[in-house]
Amino acid sequence: YNLFDLDNGLITFVPDHAGHSFTDPSYMLPAFLDKWARTASANRSFWEKAATASRQHLIASAHPVTGLYPDYSRFDGRAYAWRHAAYDTSIYMFDAIRCPINVGMDYYLCGKDCHRQKAVMYRLLTFFKNDGFKHGHFTLDGSKAFGQYTCGMAGANAVGAITLAQSNIPEYRELAREYVQRLRDVKPPTGKFRYY
């Protein structure tokens, strides 16, 4: 099995029998793939395809209203509940927290899908603000909320806010400012679960 699906250009969850037929939206790193497409000694056309597919997947896998991402997804972006996992991987839980970082980084470094990236980050950041920055896990439509909003989420969402920081829309700029300020104000985590 290959690490990337050669037909669609997306990275697989794991290149083995159980994990090659789906992916994880947080694995989508179009900015890195774009760099490889420009600098690789071989297979540049594949890396270009992979960058485009990865960028598209960060839009397709986000919920159309909340902007929330599933932890795992099918190649078409639909949420995927992997039967081998110890929890429901079709919801916003652990891996999904990283998706705003990937969107913000790609927006800043590449600027190839700015309009859609702004739209998806506005939905996501508005959703968390409307939740009062209380919860950390959700069904994708936001109907079931549990767990706590974490320092890691504050950091990831602040990176996603880069997409709104220079917007012509004052409301977008203010939302970005609020997320950056929230990150600045967060106390450094300590203890066993400080990574999250």
Label each region the model flagged:
Residues Y1-R173:
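Extended ligand-binding clefts on enzyme/binding-domain cores
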Residues Y172-K187:
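Charged low-complexity "KEKE/polyampholyte" interaction tracts
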Residues K187-Y196:
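Hydrophobic, glycine-enriched assembly/anchoring segments
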